Amino acid sequence: MAAGKRRVASLVLLMIIWWSIVSAAESQCEERNDYSRKRPSHKPFTSHQNKQDRSCSSPLPSESCSTSAITPSDSAVRDTSLSRRGLPGMPGDIEWMGFYGSLLAVPTMLSILGIITNYNLGKSYYNSELNAQYYKQSREMLRAHTAKLIQDQEKKFANAGVSWNGMVYGKDGQVNPGAKLPEWNGRVLGGTVANPKSQPVPGSGGAVQGAAAGVGGGTTAGVAAGAGAASAGTGPAQVGGATAGGAGAEAQTGTGAIATGTGTGGAGDAGGSAPVSSGAEQGDAEAGDEARGSEERGDDGTEDRRGGQSEGDDDSDSDGNDEGDAGDAGDAGDA
């Protein structure tokens, strides 16, 4: 589009220049023709006219001078001037060469100037875009390095136990809860906020293991997996330990999940690890039989509680009460 406009402008300018030159040439030609018609023609000098002039120069007034001198015709004068210097006011070869040269020089000059200007503008625009992109990338790089440096330094301070108000990153390099990350034009710089959903849910299911060491080298170990719903956590489990030598240690481990933590054990509403009572002081077979009976009762209670969890009981307090009952049953067995 721009090239077409330049061509039209060049054509219009060319027509204006050509018309002005032609008009000036025509006007000059007319003026010169008028001047050549008005001026007297040069008469060639002849001996006859010389004699006539000498006869007219007589001092006697009675003598009259003859005015019948022979003059060349206008056509002869015109032919003579044409053969010598051409028609007055009519351009010759040199004039036409200059005219055509001027016609060719003007658009050529304009074209060259247009090409140079277009090249310079394009180069300037390209360099401007290049510089802008360079500085933009430099700013982005500096911001990224700054955010990474802040994260590393605050992580080191947090691991060293140093903290301050407005501290963004913690010991693990994650963003502290409630901290505000630096922004630039509405875009957050640096790390991302830790997703709380990625953390393990308190009370989620898993294997629960309890172990106790008996007197005389006897060991008791049991593993029970909670069979309750995932939302309610691991179900309480009781594992009875075998006795060693008739006077070993009995271990009761009640494991269960409460609403506030993932700890094992089921001693009342408080959770945690269940108390392990040792039967080393009693050491008689009757206490061992009573303990075994209490363990059987505890196993029955565990089955009942597991059945309650399978029915979708999510109440943490009721789970804690059941665990408390399991702990009481274990104490009764030890007694």
Curated annotation (Swiss-Prot):
What is any one of the record's Gene Ontology cellular component terms? membrane
Bias (Low complexity) occurs at 55-68, 226-241, 249-261, 272-282
Q: Which residues form the signal peptide?
A: 1-24
The answer on whether this UniProt entry bears the keyword ATP-binding reads no
Q: Specify the superkingdom.
A: Eukaryota
Arranged from A to Z, the UniProt key words for this protein are:
Membrane, Signal, Transmembrane, Transmembrane helix, Virulence
Basic and acidic residues composition bias: which ranges?
Answer: 289-308
Q: Where is the composition biased (Polar residues)?
A: 69-80
Region Disordered: start-end pairs = 33-84, 226-335
Q: Quick one: where is this thing mainly located?
A: membrane
The listed locations are:
Membrane
Q: Where would you find the membrane-spanning parts of this chain?
A: 96-116
Q: Is the keyword Transmembrane in the record?
A: yes
Composition skew (Gly residues), residue ranges:
262-271
Q: Where is the composition biased (Acidic residues)?
A: 311-335
**GO biological process entries:** biological process involved in interaction with host
Query: In a knockout, what does one observe?
Result: Decreases virulence in Zea mays.
According to Swiss-Prot or TrEMBL, what is its membrane topology? Single-pass membrane protein
The annotated subunit structure for this chain is:
Homodimer.
Tell me, what does this protein do in biology?
During infection, may play a role in establishing and maintaining biotrophy; the formation of a tight interaction zone between the host and the pathogen.
Protein name, per record = Virulence-associated membrane protein 2
State the organism of origin: Mycosarcoma maydis
Identify the gene encoding this protein: VMP2
